[in-house]
Amino acid sequence: MRDLVRPLGGWSTPAGRGYILLAVMTLAFGFALNTSTTVTTNYFTDVLHFTGPQFGYITAIREVPGFLLIVVTALLYRMSQQRLTALALVVFAVGLVGFVLATGFWSVVPWVILGSLGFHTVMQTQYALGMNLTEESRSGRVLGVMAGITQAGALVGMGAVFFVFLKWPQLYHEVFLACAVIALLGGVAIFGFPHLHEGRPLRVQMPRQRMVLARDYRYYYVLSILDGARQQLFFSFGLWVLVSHFGMGVSGISLVVIVSTVVAMAFSPWAGRMIDRRGERWTLSAINVAYIVALGGYALMDNLWLACAFYVLYSFIAPFSPIGAATYLRKIAVPQDIAPSLAMGVTLMHATAIVVPVVAGVILNFVGYQVPFFIGCGFALVAALVTLRLDPRRQRSAARAALDDAAAGATADEAAGCQAVGA
């Protein structure tokens, strides 16, 4: 239990209760999202009878709500983060139930949009909630543990799918309904999350901005754009290469994905601690070098076992880029800017995630499968150069610097008062 982050004041405090509720929500969300995603492709093929082009269309449609997330959060900016998360999980659950009602491509599109809107919102708000649980210097640890819990939920979901479909290969509707129920349970849990800042309770929720696009946060935006482009390239073509080029079957693909999930689950807390201990500049630079190794190896090493190893390496480090970017943002932004800035980051990430894979797919028709991975190496190289410029202390926004100076002044006055009383 060494990796478990003890909340400020212990488990009986509001921070401890919030930690447990967020962990329950994260586990439920990880299970529901990954279980439903695991069976969706087969469901579209076996039940809705999608054609090849329709898979491409539905993939693009599914990413659009992520691009529009900033609009949604701007409209609901008065809603607390915990209630917004609970609402998003309800929307996600409704989308999953809609899958059961669909009979073809056009009838499933509205439900895909709803489900995507729900899970993209949760993916943003859970970072903001996690960072509220503790002080700034421990943000990476909390987010790392939550990433591990997400992977644990995914692992349980993949195991459930494997054993259920081994005996009942057409049980799609029941799986989607079960995932919807689990998502709703996660929504119930997070609804009770307390209002916190730095792990300490607030009487009322902290106000936040409707929308934020500030020059002070430019490095966070750039990292989000590069991360979205690289990430979508790999996950669009990574498994496809294992299947089409190396001829790997369903059982082999399942094993690779399970190994990747187990490794990520085991090492996520450690990676979060490294972000806190060594800082974002060092950690994100190392992660981007690892991306270059994984993507370059995937393109250059024409060997199935090495390709699987590079896939596992990439999948293991993939969650840590957004965690490092989020902790960097927390160090330079005022509290009311963090949630809308995270939403802006997701929007920018999806702007590239929609465009880049399509362009790479067109290029792929004329050249070898290696090209998307070389492009991904280029994005990782640029990101590595950007991370070398990160210096949270010097890059704080003017409002954040003023807030820190005021807090330091108040602390100094309090210390002086204590000394005077002692004298």
Region spans (language model):
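A membrane-interface helix-boundary motif in multi-pass transporters
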Residues: 163-181, 362-380
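C-terminal membrane-cytosol helix-exit motif in multi-pass small-molecule transporters
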Residues: 161, 165, 181-201, 383-391
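Intracellular juxtamembrane helix-capping segments at the cytosolic ends
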Residues: 121-134, 320-333
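Glycine-rich segments within core transmembrane alpha-helices of 12-TM secondary carriers
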Residues: 143-159, 348-356
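Juxtamembrane intracellular "pre-TM" segments in multi-pass secondary transporters
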Residues: 1-16, 193-228, 404-423
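Helix-to-loop junctions at the C-terminal end of transmembrane segments
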Residues: 68-81, 165, 267-279, 364-365
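Structural signature of the two symmetry-related core transmembrane helices
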Residues: 84-98, 180, 282-297, 374-377
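Short amphipathic helix-loop junctions that connect adjacent transmembrane helices
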Residues: 38-53, 236-252
